[in-house]
Amino acid sequence: TPKVPIEVLATADEEGAICQRGYFGGRYMTGNMTVDEYLSFRNIDGKNITDLQEECGLFKDVEFGCDNGWAKGYYSRFYEVHVEQGGVLEAAGKDIGIVKGVVGIGRLFIDFFGESDHAGPTVMSVRKDSMVAAADFIMKAWEVGQANSGKAVTTVGRIQNSPNIHNVIPGKTSIVLDFRSEEDALANEIKETMKQYAYSMKEKYGVGVEITQEIYTPVKLFA
């Protein structure tokens, strides 16, 4: 029998994969999210949290409210048990590790605009291919990540291409760059480097470029 009460909970969307903002559950618990902010969240398809909850059959009759969060001192300790994701412990032959903090996490949402034409008669010299520009950007992101290996990581894990037909030159390609680092300064350097590189696609490929959203959650080191 434990000497003190123990509560077990699961937090939601801590990396912002759905709502584009991180620490969704954690911010709820600590009162660092207002009701208005909660209701303003949209996923990449434009759906808000209440829409998604209803689709999943969750919290239909629950009134949302977290302006005050849990009272300070309500819990004396908080422990998060997390599965090993990167394979570092396994490679080192260790069973468990203790993290020293949370890395800074940033995202750039980028649209490349080209001109959709038929893939057959449109000669290469006049093409404005949004996918080619996006592919170039993705390779640059890979190179920047490799150059900062051990200190930062870069990933493009989402691509939306239009019209996405095999015999049509892409007219619009949207991607999301995810970048992370233990150093805020390095994360900012990567962000600025990739923004400049994105805009350089205009002259290189004759495409339009728009960065529609920038998100960054700073590094948090534990005491």
Regions found by a protein language model. Name each.
Residues 210-223:
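An extended, acidic, His-containing surface patch that forms the Zn2+-binding/catalytic region
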Residues 13-184, 199:
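Midchain, well-structured core segments that form catalytic/ion-binding scaffolds
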Residues 189-199:
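Short amphipathic alpha-helices in soluble, non-transmembrane regions
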Residues 1-5:
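Flexible, small-residue-rich helix->loop connector segments that border functional cores
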Residues 150-156, 205-212:
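Short beta-strand elements
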Residues 7-9, 210:
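A structural signal for isolated positions on well-ordered beta-strands in alpha/beta enzyme cores
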Residues 122-125, 189, 221-222:
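Short, solvent-exposed loop/turn segments at secondary-structure boundaries
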Residues 38, 193-194, 215:
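Active/binding-pocket-proximal capping segment
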